[in-house]
Amino acid sequence: WYSLKNKSNLGIKKIYLTASGGPLNRLSKKKFKNVKISQALKHPNWKMGKKISIDSATLMNKVFEVVEAKNIFNLDINNLDILIHPKSYVHAIICYKNGMIELIAHETNMKIPIFNTLYENGDKQIKCKNLDISKLNNLSLEKVNKKKFPLVNILNHIPKNNTLFETLI
């Protein structure tokens, strides 16, 4: 939202939304069937409610975000993807057709994206901890293991045109 709000999407080649992978990211798929709800609720980076914690642990929250981005910015679903970034500092990566790449990064505090949505012109200063730039050293960005997180495969069935399919998700 922050990077695209006043821009045309014509120059966009690809947008990656990042997910931490939640508390189950480093767990083997074999151990998934024995996961307890209490484990899935213990997000390593964010303090969240129960539903969003479970959605994060399964990557369903990212499925919702991809669908939202597609509709809000009128993007082709094929130009959107999800990457795993366990530290949760980078929230989106926008790749442009001209070769430039823009990263949206901030501290793991939901006040920041909410604040910037409410005060979208950027003239107000938020009172919270800023991201220490050195935390961006050695960024870890990985493709989603779709066998481990099969819910992301729903995105393969999203029609190019707006339909009620997305509402049913």
PLM feature segments, named:
Residues 1-169:
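Catalytic, metal-anchored helix/loop core of enzyme active sites in primary metabolism
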